[in-house]
């Protein structure tokens, strides 16, 4: 039988030199495992005389407990050292200045919406809102958009059923206000609108601001001066603004509004379309219960994302909706 004291002494030295819990676990296996050195001594007891076995077995068990205690104690010390080192590494220097919380900022579309609202609020316009789910009448019929108009097609409009849909513009808000109130009116109607379209410059949901002014003796000159003043203040430039004849079923006459956006190679102005407008069609007044013989008015509409793209130099409309903090942190 191998010398028990020698085995215990070697175990003590090995435990003292161990630098990790993994090393200690390996020592436990080497000395106390199924094939460990001390365990093997117990298996060799059968070779001894019957009279010697009890005393030898007691010594081996005592040695086994001693080595186990040494290993457990060493594990405890290592664990304490590791915990102390971890706490030291994670300690907080309370003398350092505190870190400020990361604050969010307004989304560029929200900034643009507020900028538009601010201008018209200072011009005496109220901000009106209405439901995004509309009936066919307020979204189309009351705005002089007949049943055969292309805007009613399934590929352009989200329908719930033949008479209920997601609004394609905020004009229904104007109709509802005119139905429930008496002129004069000055209002803008900001909000989300929905159309079946998706590419670099279109999304199925986008934001729109439509405006309406109704009073006695309102003329196209009033419309023009309002739009020109708004665009020059919005872009903070003395822009050239062009009104180009167009067609909208709810206004007559109607116009597309273009702004100066650089120069062509020959030095001529490069025009960029930004919004639509016109004088309110008499049939719209009739549907809303307003006397078109007494009152006249103008209306205009603009896409908020489009204006935001132009103001902030964004080329892809979809970036506004991807919630990429690398993009949003720039505003």
UniProtKB/Swiss-Prot annotation:
Coiled coil stretches, renumbered: none
Essential cofactor(s): Mg(2+)
Molecular-function annotations in GO: ATP binding; magnesium ion binding; phenylalanine-tRNA ligase activity; tRNA binding
EC number(s) per entry: 6.1.1.20
GO cellular component, one term: cytoplasm
Transmembrane spans: none
Cofactor details (free text): Binds 2 magnesium ions per tetramer.
Gene Ontology terms describing biological process: phenylalanyl-tRNA aminoacylation
Compartments in which it is found: Cytoplasm
Superkingdom of origin: Bacteria
Disulfide bonds: none
Principal place of residence: cytoplasm
Keyword Secreted in annotation: no
InterPro entries: aa-tRNA-synth_II, aa-tRNA-synth_II/BPL/LPL, Phe-tRNA-synth_IIc_asu, Phe-tRNA_ligase_II_N, Phe_tRNA_ligase_alpha1_bac, Phenylalanyl-tRNA_Synthase, tRNA-bd_arm
The family this protein is said to belong to: Belongs to the class-II aminoacyl-tRNA synthetase family. Phe-tRNA synthetase alpha subunit type 1 subfamily.
Self-association state and partner proteins as the record states: Tetramer of two alpha and two beta subunits.
UniProt name for this protein: Phenylalanine--tRNA ligase alpha subunit
């Amino acid at each position: 039988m191998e010398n028990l004291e020698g085995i215990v002494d070697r175990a003590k030295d090995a435990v003292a030199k161990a630098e990790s819990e993994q090393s200690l676990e390996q020592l436990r296996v080497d000395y106390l495992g199924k094939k460990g050195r001390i365990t093997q001594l117990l298996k060799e007891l059968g070779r001894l005389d019957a009279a010697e076995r009890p005393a030898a077995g007691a010594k081996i068990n005592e040695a086994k407990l001693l080595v186990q205690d040494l290993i457990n104690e060493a594990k405890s010390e290592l664990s304490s050292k590791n915990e102390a080192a971890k706490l030291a590494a994670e300690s907080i220097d309370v003398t350092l200045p505190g870190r400020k919380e990361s604050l969010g900022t307004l989304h560029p579309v929200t900034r643009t919406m507020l900028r538009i609202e601010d201008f018209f609020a200072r011009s005496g316009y109220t901000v009106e809102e209405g439901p995004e789910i509309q009936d066919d009448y307020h979204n189309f019929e009351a705005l002089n958009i007949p049943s055969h108009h292309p805007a009613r097609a399934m590929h352009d409009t989200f329908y719930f059923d033949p008479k209920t849909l997601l609004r394609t513009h905020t004009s229904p808000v104007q109709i509802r206000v005119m139905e429930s109130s008496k002129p004069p009116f000055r209002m803008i109607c900001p909000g989300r609108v929905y159309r079946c379209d998706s590419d670099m410059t279109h999304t199925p949901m986008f934001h729109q601001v439509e405006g309406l002014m109704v009073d006695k003796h309102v003329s196209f000159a009033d419309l023009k001066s309002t739009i020109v003043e708004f665009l020059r203040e919005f872009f903070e430039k003395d822009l050239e603004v062009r009104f180009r004849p167009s067609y909208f079923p709810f206004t007559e006459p109607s116009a597309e509004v273009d702004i100066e956006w650089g120069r062509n190679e020959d030095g001529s102005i490069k025009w960029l379309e930004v919004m639509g407008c016109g004088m309110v069609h008499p049939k719209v007044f009739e549907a809303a219960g307003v006397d078109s013989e007494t009152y006249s008015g103008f209306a205009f509409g603009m896409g908020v994302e489009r204006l935001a793209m132009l103001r902030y130099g964004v080329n892809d409309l979809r970036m506004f909706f991807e919630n990429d903090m690398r993009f949003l942190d720039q505003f």
